[in-house]
Amino acid sequence: MEQTWRWYGPNDPVSLDDVRQAGATGVVTALHHIPNGEVWPIEEIKARQALLAEKGLVWSVVESIPVHEEIKTHSGNYQQHIAHYQQSLRNLAACGIDTVCYNFMPILDWTRTDLEYLLPDGSKALRFDQIAFAAFDLHILQRAGAEQDYTQEEQQQAAARFAAMSEADIAKLTGNIIAGLPGAEEGYTLDQFRARLAEYDAIDKAQLRENMAVFLRAIVPVAEEVGVRLAVHPDDPPRPLLGLPRIVSTIEDMQWFKQTVDSLHNGFTMCTGSYGVREDNDLVRMIETFGDRIHFTHLRATCREDNPKSFHEGAHLQGDVDMVAVIEAILSEEQRRHQTGDTRPIPMRPDHGHQMLDDLKKKTNPGYSAIGRLKGLAELRGVELALKRRFFPELP
């Protein structure tokens, strides 16, 4: 596996020197300063590459070129946004960048309710609390029909939770959900968010899939033409939220992608933390079934709680993900590719990390502090090395 590190650009509190010292050779980044829907110019791409090259690093994976909301809703200037996306792919390929991660989650990117969940050892993790989320949906957002998405017990618990919240608690929870986490290109006020939700009133899963199909049929041929590997990221968490449909949550969804545009360039990001939240997702089976289309991996583990829709992020080798089995499956796919002449390792990054040690005193991007990811990368590297020595000695 190629060891990579997500970097949010020059304003990231984790420096490129830090990245290099962590042992990563590739960087996963994006041009966050370019507005959604605009073309990524070649000169901007080359400028970012030059910045990385100064530190002996390469831009391995784009994460992400954001998909404009008008593409998802099939409205407004969606055709122009698709054309701009196509051109951005061409420009990236012209600069030698051939792997692009993206997602098709409506409105919200990845979602958490608590960005500072205190663990028993004193470190902090990200958490999704189903009851806190229900309190937001039912009592803060006050979404029409929201009660249909929660059990009676969850509704009662949410009402009690909301009743105990201060104004500061309400503001913090609201901000955590709709203000935009790292990687999300848009944040909203409550009124803006309600207006966005209304745009999806007539869009169910079938319609969102159709809108996705239009997008895929437009961009995959361009990816084939210029040699770019597209890697769609799963929904996080992998189930409908706030009445919004989700279409990248299960192995059945992956099969739909393959059938809709059957091309090796129409591939996947295997995010074990996103898919792994669902107990019915067999991660090893997913890798074995779609191995030739897995172009990028995010490795992290989550811990489901008493309410199975609640979870927090565990250490990389702990939790509900059998990380050793996952890495073995990835290495098996790499070995298969080697035997066919494809010697490029699959890019991997340690996804998220606990805020710990000195990082507890620093301002960090939630989930993306340095030390927790450094620890995770070291652990994942150790598992990979042990498996290679034992089962895959021919892999470099």
From Swiss-Prot:
The keyword Lyase applies. It catalyses: D-mannonate = 2-dehydro-3-deoxy-D-gluconate + H2O. InterPro entries: Man_deHydtase, Xyl_isomerase-like_sf. GO terms for molecular function: ferrous iron binding; manganese ion binding; mannonate dehydratase activity. GO terms for biological process: D-glucuronate catabolic process. The keyword Ligase does not apply. Keywords: Iron, Lyase, Manganese. It is an enzyme of class 4 (lyase). Its EC number is 4.2.1.8. Signal peptide: none annotated. Its cofactor is Fe(2+); Mn(2+). Pathway: Carbohydrate metabolism; pentose and glucuronate interconversion. Belongs to the mannonate dehydratase family. Catalyzes the dehydration of D-mannonate. This is Mannonate dehydratase. It comes from Serratia proteamaculans (strain 568). The lineage of its organism: Bacteria, Pseudomonadati, Pseudomonadota, Gammaproteobacteria, Enterobacterales. The gene is uxuA.
